[in-house]
Amino acid sequence: FGYDLARRFFALGTVGTFVGYKVDDYLIIASDKVRSGEGQLPASTFKVPNSIIALETGVVEDPDKDVFKWDGVTRSIEPWNKDHTLRSAIAVSAVPVYQEIARRIGAERMQKYLDLFDYGNRDIGGGIDQFWLTGNLRIDPVQQIDFVDRLRRGVLPVSKRSQELTRDI
């Protein structure tokens, strides 16, 4: 399995790894065992913990009603150029909205929750609105699966409400 996927990545002229998780058996399979243990920038996948933290801290009370006003800066991704709720922002992967959410959460609270979640290397260096995009935060694919599985099971150390709303959006 792993060798076949590695060949496919190579054939596409790219480097990557696929990590799958069989929920019922707690079985993790990886196309590249070395890369599956190497931390990478979480980039867009950080929208999940960022959403949980926003809900838990009250930065967002209602994912369908709290509105983040567009800052008026025209960006190349057209769907970003408008007001968003948390639900609409995650649907179009609106980085500027999530950067604003992170600024409102603040470094102290963000660090607290990354520590509570045991999320990757927990390093928010590089700026409160950049650490998951270009900064110091790293998480490997196996850690990502563990985090998402804890959210799936509702066992993260935050309220059930924040977890349920995040799963819903």
List each model region and its residues.
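Mid-domain, small-residue-enriched loop/turn segments at the edges of structured enzyme/sensor domains
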Residues: 78, 82-86, 98-153
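Active-site SXXK
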Residues: 39-64, 89, 144
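Short, well-structured active-site flanking segments
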Residues: 55-72, 158-163
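Short helix- or helix-capping micro-motifs
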Residues: 85-93
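Short linear capping/connector segments at secondary-structure termini
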Residues: 33, 67-73, 125-133
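Glycine-rich, acidic and aromatic/proline-enriched surface loops and short helix-turn segments
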Residues: 11-25, 60, 107, 113-120, ...
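Structured C-terminal helix/loop/strand segments within mature extracytoplasmic catalytic/sensor domains
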Residues: 1-7, 39, 103-108, 152-169
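Beta-lactamase-like hydrolase cores
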Residues: 1-38
